[in-house]
Amino acid sequence: MGIRKYKATTNGRRNMNGYDFAEITKTTPEKSLLAPLKHTAGRNSYGHITVRHRGGGTKRQYRIIDFKRIKDDVPATVKAIEYDPNRTANIALLVYADGTKSYIIAPKGLKVGMTVQSGPDADIKVGNALPLKNIPVGTVIHNIELKPGKGGQLARSAGASAQLLGKEEKYVLVRLSSGEVRMVLATCRATIGTVGNDEHALIIKGKAGRTRYAGQRPHVRGSVMNPNDHPHGGGEGKQPVGLPSPLSPWGKKTVGKKTRSHKARSNKFIVRGRKRGPHTR
């Protein structure tokens, strides 16, 4: 989608921009593919906060997305491109030859009226889903499975993609957008192309209210809290941390401290780690 700039009629609108929704062809979602979406404000079943800075936001309904793409050898026609408030990418409404409807993440270049298909014998074209072993080396892909049949988990956000680098027996090598190269089972599926709506990275919210609409609450610095609320808190006026290392609200080392387990089973599938900043090397 293109970017629409607003006039500076107020201070909040001075640098604000938004989508022009030029690619959106249908404004009302398909009722049969909706599900209720309960907002928990970051609380668990006991009412304890498990994720901070969550709460509020506009009411939404969940769009049921087909991440598995296991309806093989049945062509589907793209009937509409829709906006999904629950993700950064747009979604495409598919109608299969047998009348079944489903949503998929809309890849870049997918238009209304185009035909897509899934299965081992599907063509290598945008929107088709195949097992990784059937995709040529060098192809750009998205919505990549990590376990066969579980559904795509990697490269699903707006503008995201990965590249198939090579094949080794029952595994293939995939380079992710972070620069990480990892082995994935060749029987896992992926979709051809790049996720659409890559202009999402250019969006400027302009005011705090747009962040609140998304259900995000203010992120307060520890240095401006009291000592009983955060290890960085307290002191007269602005004070340094006063510790050998910055700490989380619960006293754990943070900012550069590696948190990934050395015993994680998936470590053996990472051929080359992702690119990191100088403070984490």
Curated annotation (Swiss-Prot):
InterPro entries: NA-bd_OB-fold, Rib_uL2_dom2, Ribosomal_uL2, Ribosomal_uL2_bac/org-type, Ribosomal_uL2_C, Ribosomal_uL2_CS, Ribosomal_uL2_dom3, Ribosomal_uL2_RNA-bd_dom. It comes from the Bacteria. One of its GO terms (molecular function) is structural constituent of ribosome. Pfam families: Ribosomal_L2, Ribosomal_L2_C. Residues 210-281 are annotated as: Disordered. Gene3D superfamilies: 2.30.30.30, Nucleic acid-binding proteins, Ribosomal protein L2, domain 3. Keywords: Ribonucleoprotein, Ribosomal protein, RNA-binding, rRNA-binding. PROSITE patterns: RIBOSOMAL_L2. SMART domains: Ribosomal_L2 (SM01383), Ribosomal_L2_C (SM01382). GO terms for biological process: cytoplasmic translation. Residues 254-281 have a biased composition (Basic residues). One of its GO terms (cellular component) is large ribosomal subunit. HAMAP family: Ribosomal_uL2_B. Part of the 50S ribosomal subunit. Forms a bridge to the 30S subunit in the 70S ribosome. NCBIfam families: rplB_bact. One of the primary rRNA binding proteins. Required for association of the 30S and 50S subunits to form the 70S ribosome, for tRNA binding and peptide bond formation. It has been suggested to have peptidyltransferase activity; this is somewhat controversial. Makes several contacts with the 16S rRNA in the 70S ribosome. Belongs to the universal ribosomal protein uL2 family. This is Large ribosomal subunit protein uL2. It comes from Limosilactobacillus reuteri (strain DSM 20016) (Lactobacillus reuteri). The gene is rplB.
